[in-house]
């Protein structure tokens, strides 16, 4: 442990059960969490007050994502329900729309949701397909994944392409024309997580076999990064996409993604956590970040070039989610634990 001081939280609440998802509104005012029993908690960080809690679904919840521009968020459940909610100016939350998808008997759960960058469509992974819906809940397109269950989806930064991944590789569809044939990036194993670089030059995947696989999008040239002790689900870009942070070990692994790319180059590592890293989040300016591990330790780093974190804290159990406020210049960090603790931290002046 270095000489960094522990950062205190300025807000704390019990979610009542393990968290299923955590996310900030685009304006940075509200942070919302939903637990596995579908109880929703919305905190107004401007006043420090929590809005009235409610049950979003009759069954278990799996995901929650805010719209990239509006005070609107979406929740999903095990039975294929998708509900859209809006926070009004009077701090009352009401339901905008509700749909239920039954695409695949026995696997209708929806745990992956992702808004198109411009907010015009929501991508929903269900069974062996990805469905695009409007903000109003109207289904506008559907893309199939031949490899079976969709494990991950990711939008190209410009928003015209949608990557769908699972067993056998990645299928990249043109969201503007559902009739176009997909671009297929084949891989022999199962993909669990997916991310585009901020410039769209690379698409990277965390794999079942404890590796990270990458493709250069233009040339389709691929490469593999190995040496992970666990599944590297965390794929987080810093320094305007010049570096990629990955989990999969107790050390933070930093891969170079400059013009030369990572092929044939050794990554840098940062030793701080004693247990496997299970959450990584980057600030809105893309420079500072936080990492969390299985024993509840959170480290806050000012730069990927620093060898030690600037501050740290410890939750009561495994770190489940970490998210920074997307508001410009904001340094508010939200964190949840396996036991259902939600805490907010202000790292202003630290990072």
Label for each model-derived stretch:
Residues 1-351:
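WD40-repeat beta-propeller superdomains and closely related acidic/aromatic-rich repeat-like regions
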């Amino acid at each position: 442990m270095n000489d960094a001081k522990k950062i205190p939280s300025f807000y704390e609440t019990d979610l009542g059960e393990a968290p299923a998802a955590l996310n900030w509104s685009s304006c940075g005012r509200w942070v919302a969490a939903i637990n596995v029993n579908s109880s929703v908690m919305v905190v107004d960080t401007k006043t420090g007050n929590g809005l009235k809690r409610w049950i979003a679904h009759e069954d278990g919840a799996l995901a929650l994502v805010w719209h990239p521009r509006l005070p609107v968020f979406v929740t999903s459940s095990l039975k294929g329900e998708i509900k859209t909610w809006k926070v009004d100016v009077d701090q009352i939350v009401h339901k905008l729309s509700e749909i239920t998808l039954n695409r695949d008997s026995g696997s209708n759960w929806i745990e992956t949701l992702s808004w198109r960058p411009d907010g015009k469509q929501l991508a929903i992974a269900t069974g062996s397909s990805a469905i695009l819906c409007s903000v109003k809940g109207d289904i506008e397109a559907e893309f199939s994944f031949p490899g079976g269950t969709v494990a991950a989806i990711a939008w190209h930064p410009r928003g015209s392409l949608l990557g769908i991944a699972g067993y056998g590789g990645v299928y990249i569809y043109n969201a503007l024309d559902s009739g176009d044939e997909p671009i297929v990036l084949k891989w022999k194993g199962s993909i669990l997580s997916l991310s585009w670089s901020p410039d769209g030059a690379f698409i990277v995947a965390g794999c079942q076999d404890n590796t990270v696989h990458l493709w250069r999008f233009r040339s389709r040239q691929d490469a593999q990064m190995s040496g992970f002790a666990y599944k590297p689900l965390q794929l987080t870009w810093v320094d305007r996409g010049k570096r990629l942070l990955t989990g999969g070990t107790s050390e933070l692994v930093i891969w170079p993604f400059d013009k030369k790319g990572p092929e044939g180059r050794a990554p840098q590592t940062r030793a701080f956590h004693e247990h496997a890293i299970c959450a990584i989040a980057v600030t809105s300016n893309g420079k500072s970040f936080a990492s969390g591990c299985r024993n509840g330790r959170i480290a806050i780093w000012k730069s990927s070039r620093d060898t030690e974190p600037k501050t740290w804290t410890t939750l009561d159990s495994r770190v489940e989610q970490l998210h920074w406020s997307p508001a410009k210049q904001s340094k508010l960090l939200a964190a949840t634990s396996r036991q259902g603790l939600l805490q907010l931290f202000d790292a202003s002046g630290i990072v």
